[in-house]
Amino acid sequence: MSKIKNKFSVKTKTFPKVDFVLYLLWIMLLFGNIAEAQVWSLQQCIDTAQVYNKNLKIDRNNVSISQQKQLETKSNLIPKISLSADYRYFNDLPYQLMPQSAFGGPEGQFKETQFGVPHNINANIQLSMPLYNPQIYGAIRTTKIAQEISEIQYKKTEEQIFFEISNLYYNVQILQHQLAFVDSNLVNTAKLLKNMQLLQNQLMVTGNDVSKVQLQKEQLMTQHKLIASNLEQVLNTLKFSMGIPFSQNIQVEPDIRYQTSKIYTKFPSVDFQLVGAQNRLLTSELNSLKSSRLPSVSLMASYGQTGFGYDEKPNDFLKFFPNSFAGIQISVPLFNGTVTKRKINQKNIEIQNNTLKQDLVAEQNDMQIENAMRQRLVTQQTISNTTDQIDLAKKVYQQTVLLQREGTATLTDILVADNSLREAQQNYISAIIDYLKADLELKKLTGNISFKN
């Protein structure tokens, strides 16, 4: 494990003593009083996000919803029991037509008559239970796969949050080092300005030369403010991704850690897993459509009491009579206007498209892995090169300052050397950013990025 601490070289060379102390002080005081700010490791930030990030909470709720939907479909196999009751009072009893021939009258003639009593009470308990229903079995299979999809979607969101927080954390570290670089350059510029002012007092340089150094110092101060503002914005974004209040004062570890030449074992990416689960879902839906042509069988039973009442004295009464039955109901779909056939054709085309999408995701993933590996290798080499460039630029700057004191170097030479040093420092930081991003991307594409890694 390589570390970029308060050194900017793989070798044992360090900043000059003043610059080194200033760098340490700046890292410690960057967010104010260090006693008021907790130092968070990258893993702590990720663990906090896993608990408080709202997107992850939403996806966890979606997983719970899919679990409840599966239980809901399974509950359709459980017997259903219902109770019904009603009371009816007839102001006018219902009429019936009686054939007169039943009483010796002529054929084809009827006589109206009223039957029944005014008070009618019915109470029934009914039971129904599916014995064989292909639609229910298909729905159970489909909701199980839908639950798997929601779990994969949660994993995908988890990886995205991991990726986002890691990038933000690295950006905060990089911005901290940029501020330290600017502070170091401010120290060098302040020294140069002091020397130039002394030389001006001795009439060895002009006021214009002093103004150039003063301008460079002001430019560095402006750059310092811009970086500090960017740092605050990135910190707020990091807090948002972690799900903690913006008012909470945090600081990240100053050390930038990265591992070189690590080979990741390739696992199916979360996107590939998601497309595969969607393919299984479509296949399950297709099978459900085909099975909808099969008959369904259910058991039914009922028990009840029917009451009849008459309330006129002296013949008033209220009597109840039982009624019950049990049976089997069979439902067979015969013809629905080719609707099912058209739905099956549509689902077959959807499966074909999803299979093509799965192949596309696999090919795209292989391409992105190859590109990420190349990018990581290039940035790894760039880090080594820029480290040497920083050491060389420091030597050139220090030698130029000495030559300027001896009168053999001009102010322009010093400014050029200083700019070269700053450029080397910025190139070094950019190389680290590119390496860490390429490494994160490679971990994501190979299925190695997660909260557990």
Which residues does each predicted region cover?
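N-terminal secretory signal peptides that target proteins for export/translocation
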Residues: M1-V18
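Bacterial N-terminal signal peptides
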Residues: V21-N33
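Bacterial Sec-pathway N-terminal export signals of envelope proteins
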Residues: A37-D92, M204, F246-T283, L294, ...
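Sec/SRP-type N-terminal targeting helices
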Residues: K57-N61, K74-S75, L131-E158, N208, ...
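Periplasmic alpha-helical coiled-coil/stalk elements that build and connect Gram-negative outer-membrane
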Residues: Q68, I152-Y154, E158-P268, Q375, ...
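Acidic, low-complexity, intrinsically disordered peripheral segments
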Residues: S82, N91, N427-N453
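Small/polar, glycine/serine/threonine/aspartate-rich low-complexity segments that form flexible
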Residues: S84-I125, Y258, A301-V332, N453
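A short glycine-centered flexible hinge/capping loop motif at secondary-structure junctions
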Residues: Q200-M204, Q404-T408, L445
